C-alpha cells in the first residue's frame, strides 16, 4: 500500500474494502514518516544505511497507523508475521511492521529501494504467489522498467521481479478503484496464477 495514499481522502474507504479480502498481508509504504527521514538526513548528513533502517521504521509507523485505523492485526518483523500466518485461522488482513533489528533483508540499503521491492521480498519470504501494488496514480504501462523510470516503482524493482519470477505482480490505481475488492479478487483468480512479473497486469 503506497505511502502516498496516506494523503488520499480515499484511504478510509480503501481500508474498508481491504478488510473484506481474505488472506491478505499489507506492506505499508513510508508515507509522511519516510519524508521526515529524508529531511533529517538532508539536515544532519547521516549515511544511507542509517536512513534505510530509519525508513523501515517509518514504514512500521505508517503500518501501525493503518492497523489502528482499520482494526487490522499487525506483526513486527517478517519472522513473527510468518509465524502468525501459520498459526492463525483468522482471515482478517495482517499488517507487516518492518523491523531492521530482526528482518534479515537481502536488499540494498539505500533510497534506491522502497516499499515496492520490500513487498516483493516479503512475498517471497512468506511464500506468497501474488503481489498487488496499490498506487495513488495512474499506471500508464505494464513495462516495469518504464514504471521505474517514471518513479512509479523503485529502480530496484524490475531486477527483483526477475529474481522472484514465480510471483505474479499486479498494479492498481487505488485512488480510482471504485470496486477495489472485485479488482483484488480478480488478481487472485486461479486462471491468473501463472502470470509472470514481466507480464504485469494493470488495473
Regions found by a protein language model. Give the residues of each.
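Nucleotide/pyrophosphate-binding catalytic subdomain
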Residues: 1-188, 196-203
Amino acid at each position: 500500500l503506497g505511502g502516498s495514499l496516506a494523503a488520499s481522502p480515499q484511504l478510509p474507504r480503501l481500508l474498508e474494502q481491504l478488510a473484506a479480502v481474505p488472506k491478505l498481508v499489507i506492506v505499508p509504504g513510508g508515507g509522511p514518516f519516510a519524508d521526515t527521514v529524508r529531511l533529517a538526513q538532508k539536515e544532519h548528513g547521516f549515511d544511507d544505511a542509517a536512513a534505510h533502517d530509519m525508513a523501515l521504521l517509518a514504514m512500521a509507523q505508517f503500518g501501525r497507523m493503518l492497523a489502528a485505523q482499520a482494526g487490522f492485526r499487525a506483526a513486527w518483523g517478517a519472522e513473527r508475521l510468518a509465524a502468525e500466518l501459520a498459526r492463525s485461522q483468522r482471515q482478517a488482513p495482517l499488517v507487516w511492521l518492518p523491523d531492521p533489528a530482526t528482518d534479515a533483508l537481502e536488499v540494498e540499503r539505500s533510497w534506491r529501494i522502497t516499499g515496492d521491492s520490500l513487498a516483493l521480498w516479503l512475498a517471497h519470504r512468506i511464500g506468497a504467489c501474488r503481489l498487488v501494488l496499490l498506487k495513488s496514480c495512474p499506471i500508464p504501462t505494464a513495462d516495469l522498467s518504464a514504471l521505474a523510470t517514471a518513479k512509479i516503482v523503485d529502480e530496484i524493482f524490475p531486477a527483483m521481479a526477475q529474481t522472484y519470477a514465480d510471483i505474479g505482480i499486479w498494479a492498481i490505481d487505488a485512488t480510482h478503484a471504485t470496486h477495489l475488492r472485485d479488482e483484488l479478487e480478480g488478481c487472485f483468480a486461479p486462471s491468473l496464477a501463472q502470470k509472470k512479473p514481466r507480464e504485469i497486469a494493470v488495473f
